[in-house]
């Protein structure tokens, strides 16, 4: 894998950062050595953060370049024209038809305004049949219940 010019520059910066903070070779009292190590550790954490920012900046620039490349490659693509969604039937009041629970399963009473019997699909809770919220469903159930 060959490195590009920007990658080499980023690695050179990171190498310089880490080379600028060698581990302390200090003689002295235990307290002086401990403080020197603590200072080194804090500086090393700062260098780690800076190196992370350098790499993230490089990766972000690389990502932006890749996105621009993709945009150029795909600029000629056109979305297909999709068909219109199915039309929702509305009655004269402007209220759309909905699916709602109707009669319990096993009941052969008419549960739709067309007068057909219903075979429940939800077990004992009932089935789903298209009805209108305007109240015509209740009227059709009453008329279907009368023999």
UniProtKB/Swiss-Prot annotation:
Keywords: Host cytoplasm, Host nucleus, mRNA transport, RNA-binding, Transport
Subcellular location: Host nucleus, Host nucleolus; Host cytoplasm
Positions of region (Disordered): 24-44, 83-120
Composition skew (Basic residues), residue ranges: 31-42
MF annotations from Gene Ontology: DNA-binding transcription factor activity; RNA binding
Motif (Nuclear export signal): 70-82
Classification via InterPro entries: REV_protein (IPR000625)
Residue span of region Homomultimerization: 13-21
GO BP annotation list: mRNA transport
Biased composition (Low complexity): 111-120
GO CC annotations on file: host cell cytoplasm; host cell nucleolus
Pfam families referenced in this protein's UniProt entry, alphabetically: REV (PF00424)
Protein function: Escorts unspliced or incompletely spliced viral pre-mRNAs (late transcripts) out of the nucleus of infected cells. These pre-mRNAs carry a recognition sequence called Rev responsive element (RRE) located in the env gene, that is not present in fully spliced viral mRNAs (early transcripts). This function is essential since most viral proteins are translated from unspliced or partially spliced pre-mRNAs which cannot exit the nucleus by the pathway used by fully processed cellular mRNAs.
Subunit description: Homomultimer; when bound to the RRE. Multimeric assembly is essential for activity.
Domain notes from UniProt: The RNA-binding motif binds to the RRE, a stem-and-loop structure present in incompletely spliced viral pre-mRNAs. This region also contains the NLS which mediates nuclear localization. These overlapping functions prevent Rev bound to RRE from undesirable return to the nucleus. When Rev binds the RRE, the NLS becomes masked while the NES remains accessible.
Record's protein name: Protein Rev
